[in-house]
Amino acid sequence: MREMFCFQCQQTAHNTGCDGKAGVCGKKADTANYQDELIGALIGLARAARAGTPTPHTDELILKGLFTTITNVNFNNETVLQCKAEIEKEKAAVGPGQFDDYDLAALWAAGEDVRSLKSLILFGLKGMAAYAYHARALGRTDPAVNAFFYEALEAIGAEKTPDELLALVLKTGEVNLACMALLDAANTGAYGDPVPVTVPLTIEKGPFIVVSGHDLHDLKLLLDQTAGRGINIYTHSEMLPAHGYPELKKYPHLKGNFGTGWQNQQSEFHNIPAPILFTTNCLMPVRQSYSDRVFTTSVVSYPELTHIGDDKDFTPVIEKALECGGYPEDHPMTGMNGGSTVMTGFARNAVLSHAEQIVRLVREGKIRHFFLIGGCDGAAPTRSYYTDFARMTPPDTLILTLACGKYRLNDMDLGSIEGIPRILDCGQCNDAYSAIRIALALAEAFGCSVNDLPLTLVLSWYEQKAVCILLTLLYLGLRNIYLGPTLPAFVSPNVLDFLVKQYNLTPTGDPKTDLEKILNRQ
C-alpha cells in the first residue's frame, strides 16, 4: 500500500502532514490516495468543461467530488472510486477531445510557495463546494460560482506564477462570499429568518434520533417523516442552529441538542440508545459500542454502515429509533462548561433588529468591544484557549460566535448588556456571512471601515470550510485576525510573511496576553 500525504486539516501530524499508513483523522492511506486521484479527475473534468460545454450534471459532480474529500466526510474507498468513475464518464461526454487527469503528487512536490498557494485555492474550493452543494439541494445555484470552480481547478493543474496564484487565492475568497450569500438565501428562503431561541441539552425519555452535520434539508425531511411517530429529534454539533429557523422550530418533536463538539462524539455516543444520522462532516471512525446505530447520507460514507440514498427514505433510521427505545427516563446532559441550555438564532436580521440600540450602547461606552470567537472545534488541548479567552472578556464586550467552535463557550452565562446577551450565536460556519453583514452594517452606522470598528476576530480552524471563510475575510481586507490553535501546515513561510505584513494575521498565544493587547490597541 502506497503511503499517503495529506496536510489539509489542523490536526495533521506534527503540523507538517500525515504521511504514513493512516491520517490523524482516521482516514487510511489508500482512501487518501483515492481521494487525491478523485481531485486529479476533477481537474481533468475542469479542463474538459473549459474547452467544452458543462451541464448542470457536470456542475453537480464537481461539487460532489470536492465535498467528498473534505476532512471527516468519506472513509469509504468504494464510494470514492464510484464518484471518480462518474467524473471520468462525464469528462468523456463534456470535452471535445482527450483531457488528462492531474497527478496531485506534482502539487505536493512543487516549490513550497506554489504548493502553499495552490493548496489554499484547493482547500478553499472544497469548503465552498460544501456550501454550493447545500444551496443546490434547496434549488439555488449561481452560474458565476459554478464557472469559478472550473477556472480554479484548471489553474491548480497548470503552470502559474506566485502572483497569479495569489490573485486566484483572493478571488476564491470573493466567490465564496457570493456562495455563502447564495446558501443564506436558500436557507432563509426555505425556512425563514432565524430567531433567538433557548435550546435544552436534556434528552427526554423515549425514542429519539440524533442528527449531525449541516444539511437543513435532510433534517426537514426527517422531521416530516417522523411526525406523529412518537420519536423526538435532537440536533448535534453544527446542526444546532436549525432550532432558530421558524419552519424547523415549529415541529414540536424537534426537542433540543445532544452533546457538544464533534470531537467528543466517540465518548458521547457510547452505548447511545438511539440512531445517529450524519448528513455531512464531522464523522469520526465509528466505535463498536454504537456502530449499528450510525447512518450516513449524501456524500458521507463509511464502510459497513447503512447509507440512506438519494430517495431520502429514512425508514431504517426510524425503525432503529423505535427498536432502541431511547432512555427510560429524562437524561440530563450539559455543555462543555456545565450549562444545561444554549442559545442560538442570532443571525444578521435578529442582531440588526437591535442595531440602533447597539450603536447607542457603543456611543454611551456601555459596549467597549466586539469579538467574533468561533470557527471549527477540534480535539487539541490548546483549544481551551477559546474558552479561557471568552471567560476573560470584560462585561462591557459582546461576543459573536458561530460554527462548532461555539461549543467552547456557548453554555456559559456571561450575562447581558441592557437585555442583549453577551454571547450571540450567529449559526453554522457558513453563517460567517451573517457575521460579515453585521460587521458591515455597524461600520456603515459609524461611518467607518470594518477595520476601524472595535471588533476583533479570534478564529479557530480545523477543516476546509474554515479555509474558504478565511479567504473571504482576506478578500474583504479584514486585518488583525487571530488564528489558531495552530497555523495551517500548508502555509509556507513566505506566504505567511505576506499574510502577517498585509493583514496582520496573528497566531493565537496566551489568552490573557492576547486580550490585553487587543483592548490596549483601541
Where are these regions (language model features)?
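Electropositive, gly/pro-rich neighborhoods at or near active sites that engage anionic ligands
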Residues: I39-A190
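Anaerobic metallocofactor- and corrinoid-dependent redox/one-carbon enzyme cores
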Residues: R2-T31, Q35-D36, I43-G44, K171-Q522
